Amino acid sequence: MNDRSAAITIGGQEFELLLTTRATKEIAARYGGLENLGEKLMQSESFEMALDEIVWLITLLANQPILIHNLRDPDKRELLTTEVVELLTSPFDLAAYKSAVMEAMSKGTKRNVESENDEKTRISGDG
């Protein structure tokens, strides 16, 4: 697991949740931006729709590390589907995954200011 991801277990297998630029674009296309995500999830017209959205988001974030692996490695891994996530989880699991989703999204959007300051110090010669 890397420092930009959070881990969850689905059906006894650990998956990383990772917010990538690609995932951010898909979230933006579906919800109008990351800032609208929480509001849209809370405003789902029914419990079923809310579950569908959460399952979609978990599947999207869990597939990012698999897609990266498949890009770099000839040993391809199978992507998760929403159907698999639905079958191998319970509504209780989905509620528990909320903190991991928020952690992955927070890590994916945070800025590493310290490294920027280090770079500026090196360039200016003040360090």
Regions found by a protein language model. Name each.
Residues 1-11, 29, 35-49, 66-127:
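Charged interaction scaffolds used for protein-protein
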